[in-house]
Design a protein with these regions (language model features):
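Charged, solvent-exposed interaction patches on well-folded alpha/beta domains
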Residues: 2-163
Length: 163
């Protein structure tokens, strides 16, 4: 019974105890989804360990961030942990793409793409958080913010805004 329960994608662990003469005690630890993972044009729920869960009722989790890209399920835990330290950025996130199985791009509100570095993700998020406050980037005519080089912020304006 324990093994059958643990084969269900939503069950992290299970224990079953028999209490004679006629009782069983079942304890189940459930997996908790942390993101919606898009793979091969299908949406899946993803837990903190990178395990893909059965997606019955995925609409009940539309508040979760969407992540895309090969290997994203393995790196989502760290990315979402760092992102969670910056609620202003987290609230602007539309989806995140894992690029080349090594770094992240974010699409935030108003269609802005933020290119993040492979390393020092927290530092890059801190810079984004600071410049967003100072310059109102989240409400401007910015198309792209490139933070891949740590000592530079490269900003690209929308083509229609440059005229």
């Amino acid at each position: 019974m324990k093994n059958r329960l643990e084969q269900l994608s939503w069950i992290k662990s299970a224990s079953v105890q028999r209490k004679l003469p006629n009782k069983f005690y079942v304890r189940v630890s459930e997996r908790v989804p942390i993101a919606i993972y898009q793979s091969n044009y299908k949406l899946h729920l993803l837990d903190i360990d990178g395990k893909i869960l059965e997606n019955d009722g995925i609409g009940n989790f539309d508040n979760l961030p969407i992540i895309v890209g090969k290997g994203a399920e393995k790196s989502a835990r760290h990315f979402l942990y760092v992102l969670g330290k910056f609620p202003k950025i987290q609230n602007q996130l539309v989806f995140a793409v894992f690029v080349g199985e090594r770094r992240w791009n974010m699409r935030i509100n108003r269609g802005i793409t933020v290119k993040l570095p492979e390393k020092n993700l927290g530092y890059a998020m801190q810079i984004l958080d600071e410049i967003a406050d100072e310059n109102g980037f989240f409400h401007s005519d910015i198309q792209e913010i490139d933070l891949r080089i740590l000592d530079r912020v490269i900003v690209k304006k929308r083509v229609d805004a440059q005229r």
